[in-house]
């Protein structure tokens, strides 16, 4: 079987977690890498989309991609952009979406809402139970990066733009909690609920502090830890992945490396104090009151 086949590349909920958690940057990056081998340079033989609406209804313009050749695949924040000779398609996994790379003989399931079949009879299929995902078509000549929803996004966490000086300048004007600031896609993309809690723990910064109270030295810690933790999660296959399996059979399970997220009322791995939780901006925050005092 060709090396690009994945037994079933999925982004799912982890049963250990308390509450819902959507795929974050590492999980989307792992997904992108998983589909690249099947799609990069491939001819798109056919397109399918269901008549169910996702976050917005899928356009029949997606069928324009039939007969196109895929020229580029990339990630921007939590979006996957697939560029072809006949336009582009932007995919967001939403809360429960996952992409699978499958043989053409695999039948569709109830919640399979979009698929591309290549000239090699390989299917890249989107399954989305809760239908909070997104599949958008951009015509030839459109620049997706200058259009919604990509145009107002902040810098990538691994980009040259995302520096301690940049973060310090942005936080000086931020009257929200530092946790909410890190989750603001206009400040930096891809740091979702799980990783914001973990980054602040690693940086020994209380999530209850205001963004404008963060010192420049602390910004250095935050930037370094965002990059370190996201990189580690990508290497391990992500956090919200329950059963990711690559072609080599290796599993990704960064959930085992989480220090605070999902561990409320459990002892801190560093000091033994019970982890606390609170709600900030309708999302649950986890922290150690001693280590992050």
Identify the function of each model-found stretch.
Residues 6-9:
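Short hydrophobic targeting helices and cationic amphipathic motifs
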Residues 85, 89-190, 195-202, 210:
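Phosphate/anion-contacting hairpin/loop surfaces
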Residues 43-61, 74, 166, 170-293:
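Basic, nucleic-acid-binding surfaces and adjacent catalytic neighborhoods in DNA/RNA-processing proteins
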Residues 22-25, 157, 161, 215-223:
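Generic detection of long, well-ordered alpha-helical segments
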């Amino acid at each position: 079987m060709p090396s690009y086949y994945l037994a079933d590349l999925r982004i799912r909920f982890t049963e250990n977690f308390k509450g819902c958690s959507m795929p974050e940057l590492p999980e989307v990056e792992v997904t992108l890498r998983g589909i690249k081998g099947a799609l990069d340079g491939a001819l798109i033989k056919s397109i399918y989309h269901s008549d169910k609406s996702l976050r917005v209804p899928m356009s029949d313009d997606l069928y324009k991609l039939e007969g196109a050749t895929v020229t580029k695949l990339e990630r921007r924040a939590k979006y996957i952009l697939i560029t072809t000779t006949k336009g582009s398609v932007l995919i967001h996994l939403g809360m429960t979406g996952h992409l699978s790379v499958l043989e053409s003989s695999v039948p569709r399931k109830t919640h399979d809402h979009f698929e591309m079949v290549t000239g090699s009879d390989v299917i890249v299929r989107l399954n989305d139970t809760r239908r909070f995902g997104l599949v958008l078509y951009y015509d030839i000549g459109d620049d997706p990066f200058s259009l919604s929803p990509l145009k107002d996004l902040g810098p990538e966490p691994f980009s040259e733009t995302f520096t301690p000086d940049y973060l310090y300048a942005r936080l000086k004007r931020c009257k929200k909690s530092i946790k909410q600031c890190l989750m603001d896609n206009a400040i930096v993309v891809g740091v979702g609920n799980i990783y914001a809690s973990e980054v602040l723990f690693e940086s020994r910064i209380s999530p209850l502090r205001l963004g404008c109270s963060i010192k420049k030295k602390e910004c250095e810690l935050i930037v370094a830890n965002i990059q370190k933790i996201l990189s580690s999660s990508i290497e391990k296959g992500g956090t919200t992945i329950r059963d990711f399996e690559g072609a080599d059979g290796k599993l990704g399970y960064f959930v085992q490396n989480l220090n605070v997220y999902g561990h409320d009322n459990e002892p801190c791995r560093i000091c033994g104090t019970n982890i606390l939780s609170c709600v900030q901006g309708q999302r649950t925050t986890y922290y150690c009151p001693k280590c992050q005092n």
